[in-house]
């Protein structure tokens, strides 16, 4: 295809070089570009299973960053793609691209171009983006749609986070953390909630909240906002949006909404809910294979979004019943010695509280079972800002282990560590600075029936299997 533009891609995306191609979001875009007939090269700091998979699909991938990486594609790239957070502007490939006059564009801008000829459903919010997006995808697939999608975690059923579908719908997660959601102009926008976060980027809560108003202002003229009005921030957004003349569909626990959660109960590691939909005069039963009331609310948002795309409500409910979760969203890691271990991406106080609430609902199925929370704070700035709130959320568990801060892109802040949070926890708590000691310490206090959740956006996800191994060793 050298020198020839693939019919299903805009000219600037015919040949793309991706700096940091191994990242979850970047690799997903690479898969879609390849499946739509594009040529893709890329580089990353280290090899991974994801890169092996991309090579198998035809991508040219190099480990390490060097200006010569821009020569891997015949004719050279028509664009170089990168991300805001992970790649510095001094990266030698970006420097070389600018020297050659090759456009450097950000991943969200590429994703937005890939949606140009499709009906777009975009999900954003402080929490619940990935789960809600994934529910929409699974529901539409069950209804016979074959949507394209890009999501922040691997779907259990699909085993991937991105797909080029044959259908006319594109479903994606819109990241609010750095304002990149403003690249999109959705047909249907879903906002799960709005709560202070990412203040290291926005500076103030007001600036953070404003980006959601800017996002919904980009909804297409015949489009709609689907919004959870159980959340005060999202409810306020719904009112402001309706005042602009944009169609708003509300969901939550209150009567008279477009979709209402009337009742919810835990059923093993799943749930059953009674719901009502405004367009109908009878309640319905919604079954889920994932625990947690927050997941039931996410499912209501997915239901409204999917039906806006033309899906049948009965088929949507059937599809949601089979949704088995997303990697790292209250994912069951395994069981050993009667102890179940879950893993969750929770890295904000509200997410931590929701994960522990779901954990307690699971524990209540077994008399005498305890909830054990293992939390790794993510970012020093977030730890400092929300230390009190994190401590309050963690205090809802029966026993708590707090690890040291996962720094990610930040430098340490004086006086800020995992102990900053642990000191405020009212439940039995242990602060462990030594990551290698955590699994054994947790295994030493659990017994048959107990449920454990590891939480955080860092490498705490590695601990689940280690805890299970320690429990087996002590049996």
From Swiss-Prot:
UniProt keyword annotations, A-Z: ATP-binding, Cell cycle, Cell division, Cell shape, Cell wall biogenesis/degradation, Cytoplasm, Ligase, Nucleotide-binding, Peptidoglycan synthesis
UniProt-annotated binding residues for ATP: 125-131
Main location: cytoplasm
Nucleotide-binding is among the record's keywords: yes
The keyword ATP-binding is annotated on this UniProt entry: yes
UniProt-listed Enzyme Commission number(s): 6.3.2.8
Matches recorded under InterPro entries: Mur-like_cat_sf, Mur_ligase_C, Mur_ligase_C_dom_sf, Mur_ligase_cen, Mur_ligase_N, MurCDEF_pg_biosynth, UDP-N-AcMur_Ala_ligase_MurC
An example Gene Ontology CC term for this record: cytoplasm
Location of the protein in the cell: Cytoplasm
Catalytic activity entry: UDP-N-acetyl-alpha-D-muramate + L-alanine + ATP = UDP-N-acetyl-alpha-D-muramoyl-L-alanine + ADP + phosphate + H(+)
Pathway: Cell wall biogenesis; peptidoglycan biosynthesis
Gene Ontology molecular function, alphabetical: ATP binding; UDP-N-acetylmuramate-L-alanine ligase activity
Gene3D superfamilies, A to Z: Mur ligase, C-terminal domain (3.90.190.20), Mur-like, catalytic domain (3.40.1190.10), NAD(P)-binding Rossmann-like Domain (3.40.50.720)
Record-level GO BP terms: cell division; cell wall organization; peptidoglycan biosynthetic process; regulation of cell shape
Record's function text: Cell wall formation.
HAMAP family in the cross-refs: MurC
Similarity remark: Belongs to the MurCDEF family.
Name of the molecule in the record: UDP-N-acetylmuramate--L-alanine ligase
Species of provenance: Mycolicibacterium gilvum (strain PYR-GCK) (Mycobacterium gilvum (strain PYR-GCK))
